[in-house]
């Protein structure tokens, strides 16, 4: 049987000198006994996997509302894809796979129902009810709030008491004075963008909201077609899957190669040196960065702002606004634990935390119960699967 010490020794012997080692973790906010058989980052990963917040990701929107079809990505499938990409690249670069996976599994825990539409609504509502701008709503900040406080699983501390390395990896935007994060955290940021670019193109084609003819205006797509022998614009289901697989492989290869070159050029020899640098080292090649930038603009214009998606966004916004104002007007409708939290944090924050934890399905059911004359909420029916 391998002990924790054995696993830590294996890391020291096999990982790159710039990787983050479990044995060199800066610890946790609340001291606790180490596991005899798991590294510190293994404990983090396992704790995240067993949270209710993680399970709820299955029924939260990525782009398409969960009720619109069984085959579209959800926040859970997106999270798993990010974890797979992060582990794959970490293995090749000699980084700590387990730390990268832990950060990946937690990175979207703070997303509310209905994706970014839900985030915008909660942020706006919090501001309207007097919450300072720095404390309104952001899904990255909410992820940290979940793992440091809201998940109530242990008697000795609030939250999950994750290592400081995993928590730092969730500090995606608010890094004033902190410098770049670990290479593992940088990798998760890149894997996140990689995964949603590839699967949003795939889901857009599957749904019929994007067409092969539209995509042929996109430089990334034209280069992809040059790599894969398919007969565009008449794409079969197998063609679409082949293109998605090839795109993932191409992006991962570019990310791995460019990052390895950047690390080598900087000559870093420790994780501490990485954190002292002014720039990030996990990166794409310059041509790929330009292709991805153009693709992001294309997706924003043709998928995220498609009239059917915009209709879904408006439906979600009205639903969440109705729930929030109803709970604010009549707090007695809230569960007891939410009312108890309101005494500590104020009613708007408690409602925000409660609603951010809802799934698409639960929020829709609460709305139907609150406004029974509205009938079942229709999300424009199923899109093409």
Curated annotation (Swiss-Prot):
A Pfam family this chain is assigned to: HD_assoc
Domain of life: Bacteria
Any Gene Ontology biological process: dGTP catabolic process
UniProt keyword terms in alphabetical order: Hydrolase
Cleavable signal peptide: none
CDD domains per the UniProt record, alphabetical: HDc (cd00077)
MF GO annotations: dGTPase activity
Annotated HD domain residues: 75-197
NCBIfam families linked to this entry: dGTP_triPase (TIGR01353), PRK01286.1-1 (NF002326)
Homology family: Belongs to the dGTPase family. Type 2 subfamily.
HAMAP family: dGTPase_type2 (MF_01212)
The protein's name in its UniProt record: Deoxyguanosinetriphosphate triphosphohydrolase-like protein
Organism this protein belongs to: Deinococcus geothermalis (strain DSM 11300 / CIP 105573 / AG-3a)
């Amino acid at each position: 049987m391998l002990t924790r010490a054995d696993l830590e020794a294996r890391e020291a012997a096999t990982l790159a000198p710039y990787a983050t080692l479990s044995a060199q973790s800066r610890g946790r906010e609340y001291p606790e006994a180490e596991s005899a058989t798991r590294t510190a980052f293994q404990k983090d990963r396992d704790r995240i996997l067993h949270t209710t917040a993680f399970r709820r990701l299955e029924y939260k929107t990525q782009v398409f509302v969960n009720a619109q079809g069984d085959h579209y990505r959800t926040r859970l499938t997106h999270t798993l894809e990010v974890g797979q990409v992060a582990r794959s690249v970490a293995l090749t670069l000699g980084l700590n796979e387990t730390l990268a996976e832990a950060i990946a599994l937690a990175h979207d825990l703070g997303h509310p129902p209905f994706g970014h539409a839900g985030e915008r609504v909660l942020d706006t509502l919090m501001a309207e009810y007097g919450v300072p701008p720095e404390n309104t709503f952001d899904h990255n900040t909410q992820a940290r709030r979940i793992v440091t406080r809201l998940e109530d699983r242990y008697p000795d501390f609030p939250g999950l008491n994750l290592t400081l390395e995993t928590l730092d990896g969730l500090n995606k935007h608010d890094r004033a004075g902190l410098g770049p994060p670990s290479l593992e955290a940088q990798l998760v940021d890149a894997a996140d963008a990689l995964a949603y670019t590839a699967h949003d193109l795939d889901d857009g084609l599957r749904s019929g909201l994007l067409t092969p003819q539209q995509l042929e205006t996109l430089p990334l797509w034209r280069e992809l077609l040059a790599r894969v022998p398919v007969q565009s614009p008449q794409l079969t289901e197998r063609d679409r899957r082949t293109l998605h697989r090839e795109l993932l492989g191409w992006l991962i290869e570019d990310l791995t190669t460019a990052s390895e070159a950047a690390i080598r050029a900087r000559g870093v020899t420790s994780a501490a040196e990485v954190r002292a640098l002014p720039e990030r080292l996990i990166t794409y090649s310059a041509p790929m960065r330009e292709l991805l930038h153009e693709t992001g603009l294309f997706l924003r214009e043709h998928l995220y702002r498609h009239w059917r998606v915009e209709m879904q966004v408006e439906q979600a916004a009205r639903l969440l606004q109705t729930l929030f104002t109803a709970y604010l007007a009549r707090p007695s409708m809230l569960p007891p634990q939410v009312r108890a939290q309101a005494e500590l944090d104020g009613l708007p924050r408690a409602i925000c935390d409660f609603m951010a934890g809802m799934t698409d399905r639960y929020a829709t059911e609460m709305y139907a119960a609150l406004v029974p004359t509205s009938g079942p909420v229709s999300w424009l029916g199923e899109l093409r699967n």
